[in-house]
Amino acid sequence: MSKNLELWSSVEETDPRFTTKVNQRGGFTAIGAQYQFREATAKFGPFGIGWGVKDEHFTRYEDTGLVLYQSILWYKHYDNTGEVPIHSSIKYCLIGGRVDDDFAKKVATDALTKGLSKLGFNADVFMGLFDDNKYVNAMKQKFNGGEDTSIDWKKLVRAEMEGLDISNTVLVDS
C-alpha cells in the first residue's frame, strides 16, 4: 500500500450498524455523524487536541434564506498537522419565515462529515459500495461476526412497560 493511501485505507470501511438507508432524493446511505466523530477520535485523538475545526464563519443570505458555513478541518497525522477547507449550506428560514433553531449545528455537522470524507472516512459508502448487498453483508460479518445486533426498540419498550426484567435479555429485530 502506498504511504499516501495509508490514512485513507485505515478509515475507508464503514460498520453498517451506523448507517441508515434514506429513500429521499433518489435514495442514499446516511452515515451517523457521531460514528464518524468517534472514528476520527480513534484515529487522531480527542476533538480539540488531535483534530477539530477552526476559523468558523456563518454567512446568512437573507434573500434566499440560506446560511453558508465555512471553516477549516485540522487533524494531526504523525508529526504533521493537516488542514482541509470545509463548507456547507442549509436553509435556516423555514416555511412561514420561522427560523430553524438547529441550523448552525446541522450545517456545521454536514460540513465536518464531508471534510472527514475527503480524508477517506467511510469512503466505501461515498464510492457506492453500500449499494451492493454482498458488500454490506461482508462488512456486517467483518464488524460483528454477521450477528444482527440491532435492537428492536418496540420489544424493549413493551417489556419495560410490562415491568419485565430485561437486564439479561437480548432484544434484536426479528
Per-region residue spans from a language model:
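Membrane-interacting alpha-helical segments
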Residues: 5-11, 116, 147-149
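Positively charged, aromatic-enriched nucleic acid-contacting surfaces
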Residues: 31-141
